Regions:
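Core structural elements
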Residues: 275-282, 332
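Generic C-terminus detector
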Residues: 306, 310-332
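Acidic, two-metal ion nucleic-acid-processing modules in DNA metabolism proteins
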Residues: 255, 290, 295
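Nucleotide-binding motor/catalytic cores of P-loop/tubulin-like NTPases across gene-expression machines
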Residues: 265-269, 282-287, 299, 312
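Short, conserved catalytic or adaptor-binding loops enriched in Gly and charged residues
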Residues: 97-99, 263-265, 313-317
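Inter-lobe coupling/hinge segments of SF2-like helicase ATPases
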Residues: 1-248, 260, 279-281, 290-291, ...
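Short amphipathic alpha-helices in soluble, non-transmembrane regions
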Residues: 250-257, 303-311
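Short beta-strand elements
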Residues: 262-278, 319-327
Length: 332
């Protein structure tokens, strides 16, 4: 998990009696169990997502609906043996403890932060020097001012680049520049090491250099080509319900109605994509589809969408299907 350069940098930092912050660029533990034989992973029965493995309580958890179950002894599908897949903070902590057995490692993630162990307590222990390494997920990326921290390491620095959505580059650059800025905030020089599978990616290099101006030039040109904000509005029209054929039919009807209004009115340039399954196609037994509309949200477009949404709600054939609109938002 930890590259040789990062291991050496941690060793040098500890030898100088300084501290290090390590960020795992994933939500929570981001680990799954996978069957060695059939390669299937246990999935949430309510959603279309694989369950995340939490070794602290030896349970599988769905981060969308909250479904939780003890880890099975064997694969639920074929009875084969299960193994963990992915890198979690718990595994990185174990690796750090094995490499540096005499050094305390503070871990700050969804499993360790609680009412009885709030993040303030974890950070206070680290600030006092009781622990020399702070390991966490994105909650350690911002707002920390620790003068004795001279090293920051980011594992899977590129992971959030490939999560989809027009903001992926922006959010990745923001996260990386924030965490890089945690090193060397006192009178000691700091350094940062980004572990990535794409070291030549322009965004990764600019984040390491904290070069916002060049990143902006790169990102704004890309968004203009993609016809996404700020050059156009991106409207996600979502549909969800218990019966998948009905949900899909509702999305198709809404699309056809919108295209008919477009032909009869003056809407200006408009790109309509879908319907397609949402990135998470099912949550809590609800099937999810969406349309993607790229246009300028002018008055006539807003009026048309309000009209279609109202008509959809009154359609008796669509009873049980809900529709909603998200403009330039974060809906998945």
């Amino acid at each position: 998990t930890l590259s040789i350069p990062l291991r050496q940098a941690i060793h040098d930092t500890l030898a100088a009696d300084k501290q290090a912050i390590l960020l795992l660029n994933r939500r929570g533990n981001s680990r799954a169990l996978v069957c060695v034989d059939c390669r299937k992973a246990p999935e949430c029965p309510r959603c279309s997502e694989r369950l995340t493995y939490h070794s602290a309580n030896n349970r599988l958890l769905c981060h969308y609906c909250g479904y939780s179950v003890p880890v099975p002894d064997r694969c639920p599908s074929c009875g084969g043996p299960l193994k963990t897949l992915g890198t979690g903070t718990q595994r990185v902590q174990q690796e750090l403890s094995a490499l540096f057995p005499d050094v305390g490692v503070a871990r700050m993630d969804a499993d360790t932060v609680s009412a009885s162990n709030p993040h303030e307590v974890i950070l206070d222990r680290f600030r006092r020097g009781e622990q020399k390494i702070l390991l966490g997920t994105q909650m350690v990326a911002k707002g920390l001012d620790m003068p004795n921290v001279t090293l920051v390491g980011v594992l899977d620095a590129d992971l959030s680049l490939f999560t989809g959505g027009f903001r992926a580059g922006e959010t990745t650059f923001d996260m990386l520049t924030q965490v890089v800025g945690r090193a060397g905030r006192g009178s000691f020089a700091g350094r940062a090491i980004l572990q990535t599978m794409v070291p030549n990616h322009e965004l990764i290099r600019l984040a390491a250099q904290q070069d916002y101006d060049r990143f902006y030039d790169l990102e704004i040109r890309l968004r203009q080509v993609q016809h996404v904000p700020p050059f156009a509005d991106q409207v996600l029209i979502g549909f969800q319900g218990l019966q998948e054929p009905q949900v899909l039919m509702g999305a198709v009807k809404f699309r056809d109605s919108l295209l008919q209004l477009q032909r009869s009115g003056d809407f200006g340039p408009m790109e309509l994509l879908g319907p397609a399954p949402s990135p998470v196609p099912k949550i809590n037994y609800q099937f999810r589809y969406r349309l993607t509309l790229r246009c300028r949200m002018e008055k006539n477009i807003r009026a048309a969408l309000r009209y279609l949404l109202c008509a959809f709600g009154k359609d008796s054939k669509m009873r049980g299907v809900s529709a909603f609109i998200d403009v330039n938002g974060f809906m998945d």
